[in-house]
């Protein structure tokens, strides 16, 4: 989901909004979803008229009162605001979804509880990972399903990804691991078990005349990724 914060012309914003709604509807239709009435978008800044009587490919009726667990505004205003927009967009597609502000630790308890692994529909959380990309294995290998106590909360299960992940863990060289990591990313890019929203900007300050890092362009910053990378930072004489 992307949110257009600035637009130059009303007609451009209208076309963008309508186009996104129509694209979402076409994805549902192509996947075999049906509806008594597919609704319409009026083509202005108002909300779409959502579909009614929507059903899945096998006639499944979507659950009612689905919740998006997301941190409240007191913890993270960005994630809270995104959850409100996303819930509204999903409702415009004919699904009964509401954003529910929830404490961070409460969300963790809900979605990572093996006994409750199928008892929720949506959640939003932020996280950080280290430089070595083995987190992709922890998050998405089928053996790490949260129903078994792991971190794979979506229940993602793709044998092709599992095979590449196994090879990644067995890699003997950095170059081999990089190639396999890129393959994992390519598969995840297509399957999208997570929808990544944004990475907040990080401001880090260091003495460039005294120290030199082998790299500085890293998500979440050097402090989060490697605690400042003391093993590889060089001092200048």
Give a label for each model feature:
Residues 1-9:
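Positively charged, low-complexity/disordered segments
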Residues 6, 48-51, 69-70, 142, ...:
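Disulfide-bonded cysteine motifs in exported proteins
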Residues 8, 13, 21-26, 77-88, ...:
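Detector for C-terminal structural segments
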Residues 13-21, 31-129, 153, 202:
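Ligand/substrate-recognition segments at binding pockets and active sites
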